[in-house]
Amino acid sequence: MGECVKKRIPINFMSPEGRFLAKVFGETKGNVFLRVEQINRFRENGLQLAKNEMAAKFSNCIYTMRRTIHDHAELREDAAMTKALQGLTEGIEKAEECDSVDSLLGIEGNCASIYFGIFSKLITGNNLAETFRYRNKRPPLDPVNAILSFVYTLEMIDCSAALETVGLDSYIGYYHALRSGRASLACDLVEELRGIGERFVLTLLNLKVISEVDFDKQLTGAVLLNDSGRKKLLTKWQEKKRTEVYHPVLKENVPYGLLPYVQSNLLAKYVRGEMEEYIPLLLKRTVK
């Protein structure tokens, strides 16, 4: 543990359901003036950053849907899928035009309802799709939600560590409201990366890496990954993080596992005034 602290490798503790509990990390680094500028930048341009972030998030949902539709011809004529694509496209337009964070939150909630309303259709050849009706958490009530919650937590941990590494304050965000104990900027950053986690979850399910035997149902009704399920998921997650993807801003291939750090570094450059705008990650642009 001491060596990890010296090398600034975070050690995270999670509950069996994947909820973050605590972390061991080295001394906080970074220029205090960068954090002051972070506050100023987010106060001045927070709404525009949030609008771009949500537009990217909805675009990534559309990309995930289109990838599945491309591979499964029967979905091309599915009325619910067509309607969902239209709704998310309209969500992008509304996000770009809205004039307040409160309005943006409403648009995000509506788009999330649309997306997860058809999410089970993206799960092909695995009967766990039948257990998913809508997004639920704390606790997750079905296997698909259990995996989603676990993966989102992994992404959140990576984003928080990445932001701290580049010297930004992960607790001062531009979209998620400041709340004691919540890493609001990590919550912001993870929004553009959720699509990666969701595609990973779909791969696990569609290739039947995860099945019914990898979950336990609690007396409370919560459905959680068991030891075998967590082991399978974490093994595949590490494999995923080592594979490379094209980054449209850097114009080179980078491992998936470094994307939180790449985006955090770009955000830090924006805060320092080295970039005119911060560009969220669009999955459709990671394909040459």
Residue ranges and their predicted role:
Residues V32-K288:
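Active-site helix-to-loop segments that bind/position phosphate- or nucleotide-bearing substrates
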